[in-house]
């Protein structure tokens, strides 16, 4: 068993997540591809694949039990984070991964092909220019500096009545919550336990206020 797989198993054992043999292999395969492509294309500032397991894989998959609905878009996905790990964890749900940079989308398409992911679609577009035929149950991102930017730039993406925004943040973002636009409200703030990650992690679930 590879050092990556051994380390991944150790980390997962510190959570309540149920992760199958196939999913573990796919998560390791994703890290191996990210490490390989990163050397040429600079997709992430994290250089050590063992560190990627904590900062990219575990940091993403701890969200997998908090996904309401079936259809999701990961905005500003970069090299596929959190979208690829979440798609691996939730093969019955559909994920669209959006980024404006071609090299990132090419990488994601390679991952999808290599790992045989049937539930991921990569889209190269700026978020404000992307007009989906069908709206989403959840709009995910860990890329936005502010939640106000996230909800304003992505306001056209969630389903009108039931769609939510899912923002992955570090410290509890009280100051950001105070600055949210009038039409947006915080449904829940969930403290996430990421094994061996320094610092706090929170998932903020936001929705449109009911008229």
UniProtKB/Swiss-Prot annotation:
Write out the annotated subcellular location.
Answer: Cytoplasm
> GO CC annotations?
cytosol
Per UniProt, S-adenosyl-L-methionine binds at 76, 81, 127-128, 142
Which key words are in the record?
Answer: Cytoplasm, Methyltransferase, rRNA processing, S-adenosyl-L-methionine, Transferase
Task: Output one GO MF annotation.
Answer: rRNA (guanine-N7-)-methyltransferase activity
Reaction catalysed by this enzyme: guanosine(527) in 16S rRNA + S-adenosyl-L-methionine = N(7)-methylguanosine(527) in 16S rRNA + S-adenosyl-L-homocysteine
Which class of enzymes does this protein belong to? transferase
Concerning PANTHER family, the annotation shows:
S-ADENOSYL-L-METHIONINE-DEPENDENT METHYLTRANSFERASES SUPERFAMILY PROTEIN (PTHR31760:SF0)
Functional summary from the UniProt entry:
Specifically methylates the N7 position of guanine in position 527 of 16S rRNA.
**Per its record, how is this protein called by name?**
Ribosomal RNA small subunit methyltransferase G
Supply the source organism's classification.
Bacteria, Pseudomonadati, Pseudomonadota, Gammaproteobacteria, Vibrionales
* Gene that encodes it: rsmG
